[in-house]
Design a protein with these regions (language model features):
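Basic, Gly/Ser/Thr-rich N-terminal segments that form RNA-phosphate-binding interfaces in CRISPR RAMP
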Residues: 1-305
Length: 305
């Protein structure tokens, strides 16, 4: 009862907390889907000794062709930066004759560099955007292999051939994209046709926040069971340090002036870190437990410390 009374008194008098756990780790939250539009595919180029990273930003064709498709006088279609790699027959395309899931998996392992042909598609139903769809993959001899035929109800407006990119799978090895989310039918290929992708340095604290987000997936899974038939994503129950190496793929969020990286995240729509931990907030508000008698607040003086 004394603890309840003292806690109420702390609140009423805006006193310091008399007891406050470590709480030094950042918490995470489920991001708004609209925020995904600001994310830029990225690839790690160099691991720095101070814990920071050098990354390259892979902006698809937008540096060369612009961020919107404006054909035929239509309302402009924002173009997705990463290409869609359909994970099976579920989606806006179907396997080409003679191609199958086993061949697709063998040619598109996570983080593998691939050469591919792409078609620019206008989203056929909900949403108003354009996306690049992988239609061909090149084999080890440099021959293009037809992988997907795009459905007749999907309008295609442009194409790119022999594009080099990197496969990004958020589903764990061996799992389907739809096993992570039922409506998910695509993985991604990060690419940039500019010839000179922009390189930016990432501060150590941004990298630490990325690791915290990865850890949060495992913590969330411990608290909440998966739906029947679903599988955890690639970032669950893994050591965050294992995900960061030269060649690692992720998404970057830049500052408004695009001069620095403010966040690195593993998925377009998923968990994001709060900018400060509970302990940092408490310190800024000067409500952490006192460290010397001169800091005593009303609750400390009444109930002791």
């Amino acid at each position: 009862i004394k603890g309840m009374i003292s806690r109420a008194y702390e609140t009423l008098t805006c006193s310091r907390f008399r007891v406050f756990g470590d709480h030094s780790r950042q918490l995470t939250y489920r991001a708004d889907a609209a925020n995904a539009l600001r994310l830029i595919p990225a690839r790690v180029i160099e691991m720095n000794e101070d814990g920071g990273l050098l990354i390259e930003l892979l902006r698809g064709d937008t540096i060369v062709n612009g961020v919107e498709y404006n054909g035929n006088g239509d309302r402009p279609y924002p173009v997705m930066l990463a290409a869609s790699l359909q994970d099976g027959n579920k989606g806006h395309a179907r396997f080409a004759p003679g191609f199958n899931m086993d061949r697709l998996r063998a040619m598109t392992r996570h983080e593998r560099q691939v050469r591919c042909n792409l078609k620019l598609c206008l989203h056929p139903s909900s949403g108003h955007y354009a996306y690049w769809q992988v239609t061909h993959l090149y084999d080890n001899h440099g021959n293009p292999i037809r992988v997907f035929d795009i459905n007749d109800n999907v309008r295609t407006v442009d194409s790119l051939e022999d594009v080099t990119g990197y496969v990004y799978r958020t589903a764990a090895d061996g799992d389907r994209a739809s096993q992570v989310f039922q409506r998910k039918h695509d993985e991604r290929v990060f690419f940039d046709i500019s010839g000179q992708p922009e390189r930016v340095s990432t501060a150590p604290h941004v990298v630490d926040s990325y690791r915290r987000v990865v850890e949060s997936y495992s913590e969330q899974r411990e608290e909440k069971d998966l739906q029947r038939g679903m599988r955890p994503n690639r970032f669950t129950n893994v050591d965050p340090s294992d995900l960061l190496h030269v060649g690692s793929l992720m998404y970057a969020l830049l500052s408004e002036d695009e001069t620095r990286v403010v966040e690195l995240v593993p998925t377009m729509i998923g968990r994001r870190p709060y900018s400060r931990s509970p302990r940092e907030l408490a310190a800024a508000q000067k409500v952490l437990p006192l460290t010397k008698s001169t800091e005593a607040s009303a609750a400390d003086r009444l109930f002791g410390y």
